[in-house]
């Protein structure tokens, strides 16, 4: 086992104080899973002083402690254990954690090729498509993000789109152990701001777009954009890999990032970019896209519907090309990609009613989603949507405006209310609803979906937005089983 002192030196972690030394075999910040020989990290918490957990961690065999306060450090020293101090007020604690986590766990991201995808919309679909295409082309690949972790060895859900540093490094080890050679992962703005992904050595970073979201966390669009830029401007400094920035040049922020990146850049778009796309045909559950890159030409027949998925396919193709895969092969792999669960997912039926379940939960995502549906020329669009509780309140009326602008009828309901009053959330939404918008309030989501489908006639499309693949609803702090797709099927059964 390596010595703690050696791990500190190799990691480049800057610490305020160090006392003692010991062999280290792992790292953990959870007393439920800490093991013999681990470095136990006392992560700052609003709910308790995590230094109080040191005795429990030591009782389970922890060999050393990383503290974030002088008192915590001194307490660890007094218990006779090697300890380190990185005061959280210096702003270096998060840096020390990701550096030590990556080093102690053997820098797993160096052993695979990693594609990181960031942007307001399209992260999940783009990352999913990259993984699906790689698998189709014979490359064992993994996915990590909103849909959980999927490796050649299996899959499961995750609590965060991009987990915290220690958990993330352990997941990377899991990816390596599964036999995967590639990983496509979503990189959220929260994770970039909180330095969660700094210990990941990316080969490729894909930028999809930037529109309003998460302003409750970031405070402003400038701060939000700055967080996204870290994937392209700061994280490449932490790796010896040849990093390629893949940027949507049709998006103003993508063009701005291009002007700042020092390394290799590959741009894509429909109007601008090295890789160009053109939508030839878009249907409810399939699309045709023409692609060109230099002298190369290819046509993609994808098993996805909706105009916005044309952009996602283009993003994924660009990411694959950045990995060194030629355009024709990338297209062949993408043609075999399975549809993404809960992303423009059609609920098929014999009633002649189109039903789409989608995760769209921002004004821009809803605009693109409903624009895609409108492009299919339905008789009417009936939209069911709500807004998540304990999240950005400023976007609620904007989401209403986006929905009303492109829907013939609207059913406003609950999403994941969490600890907020569902009626108060809907009241915020209704501030964006003009008198001309044909909208009704049905707070219970089950009843709302049933109401929307009962209103539908042959040739109409019912769009159920906001939760997508989720098979639960969060009420308070409890996850209650609920699946929009199943609710839609049950509502269809009740039609005459």
Question: Where do the protein language model's features map onto the residues?
Answer:
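N-terminal leader/targeting and accessory segments in enzymes
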Residues: 1-99, 103, 276, 301, ...
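Acidic, Mg2+-coordinating active-site environments of NTP-dependent enzymes
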Residues: 7, 67, 72-76, 178, ...
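Phosphate-binding loop of NTP-binding sites
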Residues: 8, 92-249, 255-261, 376-377
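Short glycine-rich anion-binding loops that position phosphate/pyrophosphate groups of nucleotides
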Residues: 45-47, 189-190, 212-213, 251-252, ...
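Active-site beta-alpha connecting loops in nucleotide-dependent enzymes
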Residues: 45-48, 339-342, 364-435, 445, ...
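C-terminal helical cap/extension that packs against the catalytic core
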Residues: 3-6, 10, 65, 69-73, ...
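Glycine/aspartate-rich loop-and-adjacent alpha/beta segment that forms the canonical ThDP
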Residues: 461-494
């Amino acid at each position: 086992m390596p010595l703690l002192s050696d791990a500190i030196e190799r990691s480049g972690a800057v610490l305020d104080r160090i006392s003692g030394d010991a062999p280290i075999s792992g790292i953990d910040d959870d007393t439920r899973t800490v093991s013999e020989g681990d470095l136990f990290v006392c992560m700052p918490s609003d709910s308790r002083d995590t230094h109080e957990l040191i005795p429990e961690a030591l009782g389970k065999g922890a060999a050393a402690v990383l503290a974030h306060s002088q008192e915590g450090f001194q307490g660890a020293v007094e218990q006779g254990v090697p300890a380190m101090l990185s005061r959280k007020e210096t702003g270096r604690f998060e840096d020390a954690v990701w550096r030590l986590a990556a080093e102690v766990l053997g820098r797993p991201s160096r052993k695979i090729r990693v594609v990181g995808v960031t942007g307001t919309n399209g992260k999940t679909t783009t990352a999913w498509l990259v993984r699906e295409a790689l698998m189709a082309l014979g490359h064992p690949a993994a996915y990590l993000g909103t849909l959980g972790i999927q490796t050649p060895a299996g899959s499961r859900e995750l609590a965060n789109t991009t987990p915290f540093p220690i958990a993330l490094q352990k997941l990377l080890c899991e990816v390596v152990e599964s036999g995967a050679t590639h990983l496509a992962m979503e990189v959220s703005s929260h994770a970039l701001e909180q330095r969660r992904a700094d210990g990941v050595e990316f080969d490729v970073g894909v930028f999809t777009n930037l529109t309003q979201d998460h302003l409750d966390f970031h405070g402003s669009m400038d701060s939000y954009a700055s967080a996204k830029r870290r994937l392209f401007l700061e994280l490449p400094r932490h790796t010896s890999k040849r990093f390629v920035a893949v940027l949507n040049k049709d998006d103003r922020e993508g063009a701005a990032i291009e002007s700042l990146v020092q390394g290799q850049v590959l741009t894509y778009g429909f109007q601008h970019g090295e890789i160009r796309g053109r939508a030839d045909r878009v249907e409810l559950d399939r699309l045709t896209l023409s692609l060109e890159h230099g002298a190369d030409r290819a046509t993609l027949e994808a098993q996805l519907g909706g105009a916005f998925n044309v952009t996602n396919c283009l993003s994924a193709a660009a990411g694959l090309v950045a990995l060194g895969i030629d355009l024709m092969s990338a297209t062949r792999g993408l043609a075999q990609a399975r549809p993404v669960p809960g992303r423009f997912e059609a609920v098929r039926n014999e009633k002649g009613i189109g039903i789409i379940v989608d995760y769209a939960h921002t004004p821009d995502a809803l605009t693109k989603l409903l624009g895609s549906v409108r492009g299919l020329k339905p008789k009417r669009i009936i939209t069911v949507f709500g807004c998540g509780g304990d999240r950005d309140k400023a976007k609620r009326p904007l989401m209403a405006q986006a929905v009303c602008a492109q829907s013939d009828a609207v059913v406003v309901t609950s999403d994941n209310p969490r600890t907020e009053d569902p009626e108060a959330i809907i009241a915020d939404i209704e501030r964006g609803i003009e008198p001309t918008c044909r909208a009704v309030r049905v707070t219970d989501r089950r009843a709302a979906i049933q109401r929307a489908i009962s209103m539908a006639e042959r040739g109409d499309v019912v769009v159920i937005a906001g939760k997508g693949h989720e098979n639960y609803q969060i009420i308070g702090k409890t996850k209650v089983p609920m699946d929009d797709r199943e609710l839609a099927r049950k509502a269809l059964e009740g039609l005459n």
